[in-house]
Each structure stands twice: as structure tokens, then as C-alpha cells.
Amino acid sequence: VTRSYIFPADRIDDSADGLPPANYPYDWGAGKSNYGMDAGITSNPKYREKLLEALWAIPSYSIAIEPENLFSDETGIYAHAGWHGRKAERNCSLELLPTIDEQEHGFQINAGVRIRGGFSRQPKFPKHGFRFFFRRRYGAKRLKYDLFGGNAAKEFSHIDLRCSQNYAWHHGFNPKALYMRDQFNRDLQFAMGHPSPRGNFRHLYINGHYWGIFNTCERPKAFFGKSYIGGKKENFDVVKIMGGYSEGSRRTYQVFPTDGNMDLWARLDELSQRDLSDLNAYCQMIGVKPDGSRDPKSKRLLDPVNLIDYMLVIFYGGNLDAPISWFGNNRGGNNWYGLMNRTQNKGF
């Protein structure tokens, strides 16, 4: 159990000379390190007070973890961001720090942490996202906390701390960096009446050292479906694109199931390859007869309204790395999920 006390006025000048703080390495694995904020900004009276205000403006997470579990050549998951699965999970303490305005009351929970992401796992990126798993072996089986407010889920088997990659300071200081695009798109989809991962933005400290802004986000797997669509976890099929960087192996971009199986998705994919100007083919996808009445012999495999609204969000948000990826020469998809409860007649 940990209880952290962070004083932003002391943290703003961390590693002003670019050198690592105590117990941190100069580099990790094949990756490159980047510590602290730019001293040219933090020491500038024009920006310093604004930075201090920003560190108080939103709540903060704190991770307490053995440094070697992140940075050592033998066991460090940050040094080997391309590691996947349980072998790449390390125990830690995760805190959401209480705020003086009581916007957050905070929590502490022991968890397993992994690196998350695809392309962003490459060693050339100095900033990686995190995924936290709540298991009996660490303590509580679930995180029970009102992370997102409103009628959002209050119980979680895992959560993500995402960081932008394609358009971000740590990827060529890209001038297109917005940081909010993905969550804005998810919020739009939710506003259009569809289940969508809730999220917010929080600061992160690792062992007391400032690590940047991260996007807390739900992961749309079976537990998400149970929370927002209803039903049992084991009744959900969830599919996504697998790809990105993996240390020691090649990961091609292809669809695979994170929960359940691929049977219904494969059937939907097969139907989508047909001539959909043929009314019968389209009707098979949405489980109706040509007259629009329910077909008891056919299962609804697609929610067309959800798909249409999703594509509107993609176009409006200018997302170039989702159902069709510009980074893949517009020849394939990336960064999407499909979710369906097999016992309900709603489709993916």
C-alpha cells in the first residue's frame, strides 16, 4: 500500500539539465530517454505560472514501481516495450491522487501493469502508454471507482492510460499534434447514442517524477459490453486489428478475437464481399427479409446505424489511422473494435 504526496512546484524543475533523476537510467534498452520539461519554457516567466496552474488543473495518477521492472535490460517492460502478454506484466501500486477541490477523492489499488499500443511500442519512442489489470493475485479483483462520472461504469477489470503517438511531441514534434482527437471522436460517438469508451485526461507521476499527460480510457472488451450493453461476459464476441511492433517477432495487421470467437464476424465479412446492391445479400447481413420484416432463420450481424454514425465521426474528426489507415497506404484498417452479444439480435 502506498500513499503519495506530490508537490508540483517542486516537480516542474525536475531534470532541467536533461539528466535522469535518482534511480533512473540514462537510457533503457534500445530506447532513448527524455526526462523533465523543457527548461527554456519552465524558466520563462511568461509560461512558468501557467505550467504550475496546469499541473493543478486536472487530477494526477501516481505509479509506484520498482525501477528495474520498467528500465532494466532483463526485466524492464519500458525498456522492452515490444513485449506482450502476461510475461510483460509487472506489479505496481496505482493511485489517483485526491484533489483539494474534491473533484476526485482518489484511490489506491495494487495492480499489474503492461505497456500498451502497437506502432508506438518501438524503441525510438520515449513515451509509451500503460494498461493496468486488477487481479486477485495483486489484491482487489476490480477497481471500484467513479472514474468518468454520469452513468458510466463504476467497476473495471482493467483501464488504459493512453498517449498520442502519430501526432505528438515524441514522434518528430509533429505540428499536427492535437492530443484530444481520439477521445473527442469517442465522445462524439457516445453523444450520437452509441456505446463508446469513456475517457478523460490526467497527469502521471512515476515514483514521484512527472511523466506527462495521459488519456484514461476504457477498453471495449467483453467486460465493457457487459457494463453497457448487458449480458454475460462469455456471450460476447469482440474483434480488433492486431498489429504494430513486437520485439522478436513480426505482427501483421489482421483481425483477431480478444473475447469469444470469430465465427459470426467471419460470416459478416464473407457477406460484405458480395454485391450489396443485391437486396438479398444486404438483408442477410441485418437479419431481415426483403420486405423488412424480421427473418427468424437469419441472425442480425450488423448494426448499420452504428456503422454509419461511426464513419461520420471518422470523417468529421479527420482520423487517418482507423478503419482505413493512411499509414498503411490506405490499403487496410487499424485501431478499431467490433463487439457483439451473441444472445442478442443487435449485430456488430
Q: Where do the language-model regions lie?
A:
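Short consensus segments that form the blades of beta-propeller domains
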Residues: 80-86, 121-123, 326-330
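Carboxylate/His-rich catalytic cores and anion/metal-binding grooves
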Residues: 2-4, 87-151, 156, 198-262, ...
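Short, compositionally biased leader-like segments
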Residues: 49-66, 158, 162-179
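ATP-dependent phospho-/nucleotidyl transfer catalytic cores
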Residues: 145-172, 209, 215-319, 328-331
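Extended, hydrophobic alpha-helical segments in both membrane/secreted and soluble proteins
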Residues: 189, 311-328, 332-340, 347-348
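Short, compositionally stereotyped local motifs that mark structural "simplifiers"
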Residues: 1-91, 96-112
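Surface-exposed patches in mature extracellular/periplasmic domains of secreted proteins
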Residues: 198-203, 282-285, 326
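A conserved alpha-helical element in kinase catalytic cores
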Residues: 172-194
